[in-house]
Amino acid sequence: MKNYAQHVKEKLLESIQSLVSLKEMFVMHRDKDFTRNRKLSFETLIKQILEMEGNTLAHELRHYFSFSLNMPTVSAFVQRRALISPDAFLYLFHTFNFAIPFENLFEGYRLIACDGTDLNIARNPEDKENYFQSNPDEKGFNLLHLNALYDLCSKRYLDTLIQPGHKENEFRAICQMADRFPYSGKTIFIADRGYESYNVFAHIERKGVNYLIRVKDKDSNGILGAIQFPETDTFDVDVHKCLTRKQTKEVKAHPEKYHFLPKNSTFDFLDLHTNPFYNMDFRVVRLKISEDLYECIIT
């Protein structure tokens, strides 16, 4: 194969051309936006935004247009950029990913890591969903929360979900990304303790993929704290649980079989009438990783 970096670049440019051919679907006013030939065409804007390095807009424009005296103004760029729907970049993201095969696997499996992080954005006290202020007399800041799926073997992002800073919910984010996961083949979702949830397990299972999630230890207030395990330091056991919101005599008499979920515990596949029970089977492994330190995973 030709130089891999050049191959990837060609696929990106092909994906951009595919987007340009459908630009009417990704503008705010399809009957008039980008219908005339101007310096800041739809294609030029897409490429320039992808090439930006985090400098000021004035600096980015000078660099992109090679310090031309006829380059567009910052105001013109902002106005033209506002005509492009965010869905344009979502389309480009997925089209580009699909254009390059997933050839790097781990023993036949695609390994998908899920995690989240805060992103600092421009300070704006009027942006209530994203503005944080520790004390009334202190200068505040703005944050977004980025959730992402990352292919560990291919070293590329497969999906992202951005949430307002004050509405961060990593449980909901991984469920949404699992629901819309478009790739076929053997796959394992991998996540840390912040994703320990029956609802997360169920969403991933129902997508037909596997998961491996680090969880709190057996003596904690987490999922394992409500399950009986062997009196050994390490173990590898299969667990069956029937989840329910009912509190019948049967449920109370058999805690080894049933797990009661209160109303404030999110689970999207239960209700008291049509779906009162939900069966789950999973494997719990407790590993010794140092002299006095253990880790637990559910898979």
Question: How does the language model describe each region?
Answer:
Residues 132:
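Extracytosolic and intramembrane catalytic regions of membrane-associated proteins
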Residues 57, 70:
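Flexible coil/turn residues that form the inter-helical turn or adjacent wing/linker of helix-turn-helix
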Residues 88-100:
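Short Lys/Arg-enriched helix C-cap and helix-to-coil transition segments
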Residues 110-112:
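Conserved beta-strand elements of the Class I
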Residues 60-67:
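Short alpha-helical "recognition helix" segments of helix-turn-helix
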Residues 1-55, 63, 77-84, 91-92, ...:
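Single, function-defining residue in the core of a domain
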